[in-house]
């Protein structure tokens, strides 16, 4: 588990739970069925990983903490937080310090645990929405600011609410004692890790892995090429120049995996299409009538090809894995339905679901249903 997180560098977290949370699913794709407590323990009592902003909210190897201190320092003074700081200190003098003090005395705390979460009345335009309810709290926003600025750290979650505690109670002392690299050095290390994780990639794909700006990525890539830590590369059929990590090796892939929409393999959709000829369609935030494939669609990797996609949902009330749609790619191999059925069985077992139900939607559904019913 620790090695898998270290190799990926960033395991994205997301609130969507129609099947299982994204970070658990990303590790299932690589490790197969595993006790989810192992990932929780990695960021919990074992203190071998931590949560911060990598590629969006992410689980990161603990050794990355020094590499992200520049991001924390910038967040502390970032203009995007200036309005909130000015308003809350104007309306509630000392509130930020009081929140930090309460966490020190009573942490770890979620925002709902605060003695005064300082809820705000929502603007009328959001009256019918539940999406922004939590942001109607100065307490929640204060905790998020202190987290972004590196003054608090995440200590697990309560439901899906982040719990906050003092940095020194979350990050091991030996990690806090590590020297803080310059922003340039830290960014070079992040770029190098992204390049190693991707194998061969364009500048945009590398920068997107840890959400670096285009200008920063351009400078760090140039420096790494000049030092010989990265190699410039040309890939047949690619319009843009690429970069290759010297340690990259051509490997033989014999994978069989369902991929979370938030998997690092799918971070950059143009890259997915260039590598696999597969247009990843991310439709979570598309209106239902406009969706082509479904709400929570997982590409299916077989060997070194993305050969199908399935729209999945875990019906926990009936303990059923619902395949709401199944769609094959043009070059679908004949073995794909049986291989996909086997992967769905592994997924259902891991999620403690008793049965699999395949709906009619999608060209692959009849063959997949037959394969699911034809248990070995």
Model regions and ranges:
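Long, charged, low-complexity, helical-prone intrinsically disordered regions
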Residues: 1-376
């Amino acid at each position: 588990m620790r090695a898998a997180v270290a190799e990926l560098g960033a395991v994205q977290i997301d609130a969507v739970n129609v099947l299982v949370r994204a970070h658990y699913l990303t590790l299932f794709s690589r490790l197969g069925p595993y006790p989810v407590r192992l990932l929780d323990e990695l960021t919990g009592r074992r203190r071998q990983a931590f949560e911060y902003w990598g590629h969006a909210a992410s689980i990161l190897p603990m050794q990355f903490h020094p590499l992200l201190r520049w991001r924390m320092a910038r967040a502390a003074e970032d203009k995007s937080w200036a309005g909130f700081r000015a308003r809350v200190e104007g309306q509630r003098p000392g509130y930020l310090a009081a929140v930090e003090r309460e966490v020190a005395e009573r942490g770890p705390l979620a925002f709902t645990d605060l003695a005064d979460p300082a809820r705000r009345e929502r603007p009328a335009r959001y009256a019918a929405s539940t999406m922004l309810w939590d942001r109607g709290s100065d307490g929640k926003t204060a905790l998020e600011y202190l987290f972004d600025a590196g003054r608090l750290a995440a200590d697990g979650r309560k439901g899906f609410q982040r719990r906050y505690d003092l940095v020194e109670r979350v990050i091991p002392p030996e990690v806090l004692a590590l020297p803080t690299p310059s922003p340039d050095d830290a960014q070079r290390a992040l770029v190098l890790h992204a390049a190693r994780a991707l194998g061969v990639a364009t500048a945009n794909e590398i920068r997107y892995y840890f959400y670096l700006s285009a200008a920063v990525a351009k400078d760090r890539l140039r420096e790494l090429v000049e030092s010989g830590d990265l190699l410039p590369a040309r890939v047949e059929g690619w319009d843009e120049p690429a970069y290759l990590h010297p340690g990259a090796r051509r490997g033989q892939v014999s994978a069989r995996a369902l991929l979370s929409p938030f998997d690092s393999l799918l971070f950059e959709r143009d890259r997915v299409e260039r590598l696999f000829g597969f247009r990843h369609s991310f439709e979570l935030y598309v209106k239902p009538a406009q969706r082509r494939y479904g709400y929570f669609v997982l590409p299916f990797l077989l060997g070194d090809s993305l050969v199908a996609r399935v729209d999945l949902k875990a019906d926990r009330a009936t303990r059923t894995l619902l395949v709401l749609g199944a769609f094959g790619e043009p070059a679908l191999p004949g073995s794909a339905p049986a291989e996909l059925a086997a992967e769905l069985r592994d997924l259902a077992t891991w999620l403690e679901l008793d049965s699999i139900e395949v709906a009619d939607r999608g060209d692959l559904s009849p063959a997949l249903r037959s394969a699911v019913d034809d248990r070995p």
